[in-house]
Amino acid sequence: MSEFQTCKTDLTKSRLVATDQAAALANLKGGDILVRIDRFAFTANNVTYGASGDSIGYWHFFPAQDNDSGEWGCLPVWGFAEITASKVAGLDIGERLYGYFPPADFLTLTPTKLSPQRFMDGAPHRAELPPVYNNYLRMSGEQSYDPSMDDLRALLNPLYVTSFCLCDALQDAGYHQAEQVIIVSASSKTAIGLAQGLADDADAPSTIGLTSASNRAFVESLGCYDQVISYDELEQVDASKPSVMVDMSGNRVVLGTVHGALGDHMLTCINVGMTHWEDRDTPKDPLAAQIIRERSGFFFAPSHIQKRIGDWGQDGYNARTDAFMARRAEQSKSWMQVTHIAGFDAFTQVYNDVVVGKMNPNEGLVVIL
């Protein structure tokens, strides 16, 4: 049994720590369940969890074992697990769950707010963390559950939830009266979901995708961007149009260049991810100084989710997101290639490719345990 851990200050460093499932079983208390993690997805989204692990609290969900120095953490992942031991009435051995897990073989959960469809983990150390991450879905409560979709669900649902929230926030704000939406790191899966959502809205402004030269052909093939511009051709961005930027990259050079060109036409910049997380500590330079920080802000999807659940109710929120997800999942079949990684040793070999951005944009990694 193993737990995959990441160095908090250098995401390229990782280690495997042996874990004791027998001890976890022996220590199981009344009200607890033990689950065996079956599979999980790993994407640039997980890298963002690490890059903002301290500021937002992602390192706190699953405290790393054998970590007296505090140097190591568990990057949260989305995936599936089965109950292997239960001291909770109504949760049976063998039941399948979808949710937020550590990259490990097993996890102890303390279910609360149990319903036929879901429960919340009531572990004390998670009480102050965003509720959306503490929610576990019971596959036994889904009439339309299709196990063949597990890989795509683990890969895309966490990302497309953010895509949905971004679409909704932009629509709710009337696109800030912009004439174009500029999406940075247009090949990222969250960006693709956003662009596809905007393409479904007849009232949306034109959508411009910025990406690397190597990913340009792929992004163009998706057909959801009105224009695709590579990072070495940023002068092609029409700086005369009032613009909203949605940044998935954290790339200070790209942001500084485009902000500087747009000037007053840069209405707002929504910062979402950090596919270029290594740029965040780059010493200030003239380009970085051009970033218009007073009109930039970090978008935290869990807060938007809680707002919309309050506005629409849980059922109303679920209906809207389910429809969005179903459309995106169907579209993903034309471009997504799922790669299975067998176990933690194999995952260790490809982990850094994701962290440093070497993965093909149409590839999705699912680790099978």
Give short role names for the model-derived ranges.
Residues D226-Q236, F300-A301, V338-G343:
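Short acidic-hydrophobic, aromatic-tinged amphipathic segments that line or gate anion-handling sites
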Residues Q306-L369:
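C-terminal hydrophobic helical "lid"/dimerization subdomain
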Residues A191-I192:
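N-terminal Rossmann-fold NAD(P) dinucleotide-binding loop
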Residues Y100-E179:
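NAD(P)H dinucleotide-binding glycine-rich loop of Rossmann-like/cofactor-binding domains
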Residues D10-F40, A44-N46:
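A short N-terminal beta-strand-loop micro-motif at the entrance of redox/enzyme domains
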Residues A26-F40, D54-L107:
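Glycine-rich beta-strand-centered segment in the early N-terminal region that forms part
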Residues T257-E330:
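Glycine-rich phosphate-binding loop and adjacent beta-alpha segment
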Residues A199-L255:
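Adenosine-nucleotide cofactor-binding segment
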